[in-house]
Regions:
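Divalent metal-coordination and catalytic microenvironments
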Residues: 24, 36, 62, 74, ...
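Short Gly/Pro-enriched turn/cap motifs at secondary-structure boundaries
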Residues: 12-13, 99, 119-121
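A short linear hydrophobic-aromatic micro-motif
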Residues: 8-11, 116-117, 173
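Short loop segments at secondary-structure junctions
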Residues: 27-29, 79, 113, 133-135, ...
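Metallo-beta-lactamase
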Residues: 119, 124-173
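Aromatic/hydrophobic pocket-lining residues that form the small-molecule binding cavity
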Residues: 37, 68, 160, 164
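Conserved beta-strand hairpin/beta-sheet module of binuclear metal-dependent hydrolase folds
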Residues: 2-51, 129-139
Length: 173
């Protein structure tokens, strides 16, 4: 992998709750990853095609339905690995042959660049964030004006507090 990242990211607001689907791609290789594929992905897939991107990975921040409900649609057309935190995989209990279980501080390549995982339990036991360059894809761990709910199945306010504190203390300003 090279030192200088060539990654770009685009957000798409989808579904009745305006969830965010992220598309990350390497500008050199055109390899792409989709984060939290949910709801209608028409706009995302059209953008991918328009830019000549090659979808290579599915990344999940957590397993709630509103973040994963289009995985099967993607897998009908593509044989893609699904990256998920190991604790979330156990919590979700959904079986896919192509799950790649990650741990905190793991990293993997996308094209010629690297993406790191950060385990951020609280919203769910295996919630995670993805970090690259100066970007943080936080799923439902962190919002502009708050954090994800901790009162749903698997949520834990104390773990959320510790996760947010960890993000604050360990990410570059």
């Amino acid at each position: 992998m090279q030192d200088k990242s060539t990654l770009s990211v685009k957000t798409f607001d989808v579904g009745p709750m305006l969830n965010i689907v992220y598309l990350i791609w390497d500008n050199t290789t055109k390899d792409a990853a989709i984060v939290d594929p949910a709801w209608d992905l028409t706009e995302v897939l059209n953008f991918t095609k328009q830019k000549g991107l090659k979808l290579r990975k599915i990344l999940l921040t957590h397993s709630h339905h509103d973040h994963v409900n289009s995985i099967d649609i993607l897998l009908k057309e593509n044989d893609l690995p699904i990256y998920i935190n190991k604790f979330e995989a156990n919590f979700w209990k959904k079986k896919y042959d192509n799950l790649i279980m990650t741990d905190s501080n793991d990293s993997f390549s996308l094209g010629k660049s690297s993406i790191s995982t950060i385990h951020t339990p609280g919203h769910t036991p295996g919630s995670c964030c993805y970090s690259f360059d100066e970007n943080l894809i936080a799923g439902d761990t962190l919002f502009v004006f708050g954090c994800g709910r901790c009162d749903l199945h698997g949520g834990n306010p104390e773990e959320m507090y510790n996760s947010l504190k960890n993000l604050k203390n360990n990410l570059d300003q």
